[in-house]
Structure formats: C-alpha cells, structure tokens
C-alpha cells in the first residue's frame, strides 16, 4: 500500500521557501564519554576465574542429569537455570530432559507443575496444547503460585488460544497482593510478573535481578548460585571489551562531534545488542549490530531534526541509487552520514552477494523516514493504517534483523534470503512490537519536538478517543502481536537458524525493556541508566 498522502495534502516544499533554521531535538550529551569507557576495569577478564567456573559447570551437569529426580524437581531446576542466565551452558542436557518429559509425562494434578511444564516446553519449541489446563484452572484458584505460573505461561499463547487469556489470572493475582499475610517470595514474583511478564523481559537483566532474588531463597543451591554469579561477571567482562571496541570505532567516525543535533547514545546502542544476543561467543555480532544501531540513530535524527525536505529527498535518492552524485547539494554533515554508512556496508559485506540485501534494507528504512518527513512538513496526520504500514519499517527492526541474519547464518540459505528480502513474519512482528513499544514510551517527548504523530495520536484522531483509550488500544495491539510472534517462532516451516529467531524475539523483548519507563534510548532516563550500570559496569560480589 502507498503510505504517502495524496498530492492535495501537501504542496511541494522547496529549500527556498522553507525556514532553514534547523530544528533541535534538545538531546542531552552522553552520560558515558570515551575516556570513561576505555578506563573501565573488570577483574573477571582473562582466564583467572575459568578453572573454578569449569569445575562448577561439570558439577552442575551431574546434578542436572542425576537419576531419581522427580519430574517437577527437574522442571524447577531448568527454570532456575534459565532465570539465572546459565541455561545456555546446558542446552543438550535440558533438551534431553524436556524431550523425555514430553514423551513420557503424565498429567499433573498441580496447576503450578502443569503451568511450569507448559511454559518450558513451549519456550523450547515443543508442541503442547492448551488443553493441558482443562479442568485445572477453575479448581485451583487458591493456589497463588499456580495462578502466577499460569499467568506467566499465558504469554506464550498463540492466536485463538482462549484458555490462556490473562485477564482472570491477573485479577486474582492483584487481589492476592492486597492480603497482609502472604509469602513475600511469591509476592515479589507476582509484583514483577504484573509489571512485565517473564516472556517479555530482557534475558540478561532478568538474570541480574533473579540472582539477587535467588540468593535469599531457602531452597537456594549454593553450587548453582556461585556458578550464576561467576558466569554473569565473566560474560560482563567480555561485553566490556566489545563496548571498548565500538567506542573506538564511534570516535573515529567523527559523527558525534560533527552532528551535534543527533543523539550520541553509543552505550545505549550497545545495551540493545546485549538484549538481542548476550552470549559471550557472539562478540562480533554485538560489535557490528552496535554500529548498525548507532548509524540508525544518527540517520533517524538527520530526517527527524536536521534536514529540509529537499535535502532529505536528495539523501534518500543517494541511498536508493548508492550514487555520490546525489550528494552535491547536501550539507557536509549529511555527506559524512552517507559515507559512514557506505563504508560500514562495505566493511561488513565480505561477500559481494550480501551487499544488495544490506543496501535494500537501508534503502527501505530511508524511504520510510522520507515518508514521515513529508507528513511532518505538510502537517498531515496519517490514518492508523497508513501509519502502521510505514512505521514497522521506520522503527529500523528490519535493518537490524537483516544484518543479524548474515552475522548468524553459516552458510547462508537461498530460501532464507527470499524470506529475508520480503521481511518474513518473524521480522515483521518483532518490528511491530518494537514500533508500538517505542510509541508508548516516546510519543509525548517526540510531539513536543514537533515530530510526526505516532500511533497513539493517529488512533486518537481517527477514532476520536482520549489519549488513555488510545494507549490502551496500543497495549492490546502489543499483546496480540506477541501472539503472532509466538506463532511464527513455533512454525517449523522457515529456513532461519534458531539463533536468528531467538534474536528476533529478543529484539521485541528489548523494546519492552527500553521503553518500559519512557524513552530509555534518547531520553537517558534514570531507570535505563541504572539498568546499564547493573548490567555493564557493576560486577556481582561473590556469595
């Protein structure tokens, strides 16, 4: 669908009749400068702690595979391994246990055990029907832990799974919190689930929080706690090395210095990549994706804040044709942006066959930015359909995930390239969640800057409803889109590697994290600052 307004909605705007006083985003300087990043020291770098870590890992494997454990004990151990952030060390053991449970399990009489089994099996790609809950949910309303785990399991639902609707479990959990004599450990988990469900949370931040929570539990396993703390700190040290590398690259580009109107958010851009893939062996992935994020943020501000419409048309033409002749009439800092992007693509695409896919993704992004610029300069308020058709591209998720595929896939699959170019549902639904979460978190600030209306304002204008009603509608759309993303994740008939699918899911999770308390990307709110400090700059003391 053509998402541009019809010609009568705006007249041609030329540089001569535009006010060339440049807009300002009023963005604050970065909180973390180059010298600070390079000065960070982490005691867990190198091999100093690896011997002890490997000993703990071997002991943990024995515990996981120990004979005689009951099904529920195994499920609880797997759940703890996942929430503590160390399950990636035991993938084969976990899949072996879950495969056995799927094949030989008998129905549990506990809502808690059933919900835990359902969630873990679905998370690992096993088909399990919602019918497993038949007759259980209505008869176990006094089992608060069971209701909590059913609530968490419900977020793995796909479209049409009415048995897993969250409304009545949420109501029960909110009522539970009003009681005075309640289990404080359960209450903390309930509070956290109602704030944001586990399935939507950023994995590494959840591990950071859960380690502190697990440490205080009476059933804590000291071996597992020590392993989780060591793993967190060792992985954090690897992340810091990645950050130092991209900080040097960012400084060398000169973009922050020469484009003062743009957001200088390198650490936040790196934070995104940890959310998408934190695994220590994916350092190159994080380094390249941080560059993608930094370039996206800068080019977005060129369109949103700096460029005139004529300049943006020329810039888009240059990107579309990858021809420097289009740059002649552009300001030097816009030329610098173009060359930084072109250099980056040529650096990443070691295989010439990859270049067209990367360029196509960037072209689509810039064309979507241009559509929004035309809406802005003409003061046009798009319909909700027009906005959404363009906005899932302009949020940049397709660019991020196209790069992610080439960083993960080895070898590249021809069928996957077709799905990649046409933005498979896995990409589309992840992008839509990112867009809607972004709109909920940023629309107020962006409207103050004079940006194009977001989904909230488009819906308010079209349906003549209040802002709160529009926000509630956007929250509902996010929930429905998660069901579609769950379905796309479960479908076996796609040629993408599992790690790519996980990255797409994690991008949606990262969106929920970054915009949970407002604009955590551009606005540098205290919540995001604290999360970055906890994840990157503060090691966990030994237990």
UniProtKB/Swiss-Prot annotation:
Keywords: Chloroplast, Lyase, Magnesium, Metal-binding, Plastid, Transit peptide. It comes from the Eukaryota. Mg(2+) 2 binds at residues 300, 304. One of its GO terms (biological process) is circadian rhythm. Confined to flowers. Pathway: Secondary metabolite biosynthesis; terpenoid biosynthesis. Mg(2+) 1 binds at residues 300, 304. Its main location: plastid. Its EC number is 4.2.3.111, 4.2.3.108, 4.2.3.15, 4.2.3.-. Induction: Enzyme activity levels follow a circadian oscillation, reaching a maxima at the transition from day to night (diurnal rhythm). One of its GO terms (molecular function) is myrcene synthase activity. Residues 1-22 are annotated as: Disordered. Mg(2+) 3 binds at residues 438, 442, 446. Its cofactor is Mg(2+); Mn(2+). A motif (DDXXD motif) lies at residues 300-304. InterPro entries: Isoprenoid_synthase_dom_sf, Terpene_cyclase-like_1_C, Terpene_cyclase_plant_C1, Terpene_synth_N, Terpene_synth_N_sf, Terpene_synthase-like, Terpene_synthase_metal-bd, Terpenoid_cyclase/PrenylTrfase. (2E)-geranyl diphosphate binds at residues 263, 300, 304, 435, 438. Binds 3 Mg(2+) or Mn(2+) ions per subunit. It catalyses: (2E)-geranyl diphosphate + H2O = (S)-alpha-terpineol + diphosphate; (2E)-geranyl diphosphate = sabinene + diphosphate; (2E)-geranyl diphosphate = beta-myrcene + diphosphate; (2E)-geranyl diphosphate = limonene + diphosphate. GO terms for cellular component: chloroplast. It is found in: Plastid, Chloroplast. Monoterpene synthase (TPS) involved in the biosynthesis of monoterpene natural products of the 'cineole cassette', volatile compounds present in floral scent. Catalyzes the conversion of (2E)-geranyl diphosphate (GPP) into alpha-terpineol and, as minor products, sabinene, beta-myrcene, limonene and 1,8-cineole. Belongs to the terpene synthase family. Tpsb subfamily. Monomer. This is Terpineol synthase, chloroplastic. It comes from Nicotiana alata.
